[in-house]
Amino acid sequence: MADPALVRALSFYVPAAVVVATVLAVRPDRRQGGAALLAGLWNATALLAVNVVAVRAGWWRFDSVGGELAGVPVDALLGWALLWGALPALLPERVPTTAVVAALVWVDLVAMPAGAPILVLGDAWLAGEALAVAIALIPGLVLARLTVSRRALPVRAAMQVVLFTALIFVGLAYVAVFANGGEWPDLEAGVAFQVTVLLAAPALAAVRELARRGGGTPFPFDPPDRLVTTGPYAYVANPMQLSCTLLLVAWGGLLRTWGLVAMAVVSASFAAGIAGWHETLELERRHGRAWSEYRRRVPVWRPRWRPWGGGTDPAVLYVAPGCDPCEGLARWLGARDPVRLDIRAATDAPTPVVRLTYIGPDGDQTAGVAAFARAVEHLNLAWAWLAWVLLLPGLARFVQLVIDAMGGGPLATPIGGCPRNGSPPPEAEVAGSLDGALRSDAM
């Protein structure tokens, strides 16, 4: 029988040595190294979940003592994540994905039975292997290759959100259970869900803004091409770090666990210290005076009450003339002096309009409930926070469906977008009255 200590050591050091040798041979650039890190983190998180499920389902169990996370040997988990995550991400793209997956699955099919005595396989262990391939190996490799090639930005951004959300909540769960003597503490699920949604909204809105306006992601090795100063970034320079810190503090209070508060302090200190210093240097190098001006106007941790209006052209909200609720909304917005938002009649829109339509300074367009949310972002922090909640994935569409079902659907005839030759469009007279009403209301 093999020595358990030797098996555990080999389970980490062999994959680590292979990864180091690959790095020395390939000499990955910054983006490829970042992709390897992302894939390794994805596999570490997903494989932890797979092993917890596998033990509960009886697919396999671990006979080990010490150095465990949720009953899984940490050294074996890290070695597995290096082999399935970092290693394939470092390989050249010319190596076919199917060949990489097939080779790594074959290695695992050989290594799993050889894991005795620390790993004891059940009769249905191949079910756990299939689950691991489906949610760890393949998604991690896809994320890595998309990151290196800069393809499918929405997919990359969404997968990063899933990854870092999982990392945060794995940390939350582990610290909370450890502090409670190995059991999950009592918690009102409804309250926890509402607090999480409320505090996570700015971070998710920031990810969306970086992808749609900046052409990149929050990950330092996959950054935006353009400086983003809209959305949450018009209020605070670090919306994601702020959301993460507030979440940890809030969950620490809900679970009465000081360890989570300590995690928040450490996280904030790191973000404000070494990470903040490095980020500032990098952004100054890439964006120059635009970044310096932005940082003078927008705090890092303390949000502004009103958004900063510099750095971009005004956004435009197009309102259908003759629509009483739309005109009322336009007057309501105009009376509150929105920052860098022009309100115009839909007859002036560059594309046909059937709903309230918002067009950002870069041409990004939304309609209906989402357009309302983007418009109120220009008012103040309270309205902006409501907008970020409303813009959570699926929520704006659900609210739009409810409004449509209650009779607030799109216009039967589109307005604007196709100017006629000769005389102005028949809506122009009504549009003029809308513009006049907005001007008189502003006065």
Predicted segments, located by residue:
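Short hydrophobic helices that act as membrane-entry/anchoring signals
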Residues: 230, 237, 377, 381-412
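Glycine/small-residue-rich hydrophobic helix-like segments
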Residues: 239, 248, 364-367
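Aromatic-acidic/polar surface patches that form glycan- and anion
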Residues: 225, 235, 364-365, 391, ...
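Soluble, non-transmembrane catalytic domains of enzymes that act on hydrophobic metabolites at membranes
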Residues: 310-384, 408-443
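Membrane-anchoring alpha-helices and their flanking helix-loop junctions
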Residues: 1-229, 245-316, 336, 397, ...
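Solvent-exposed interhelical
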Residues: 225, 230-236, 241
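A conserved hydrophobic position in a structured secondary element of the catalytic/binding core
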Residues: 202-205, 237, 321, 367
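Short phosphate-engaging motifs
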Residues: 241, 290, 325
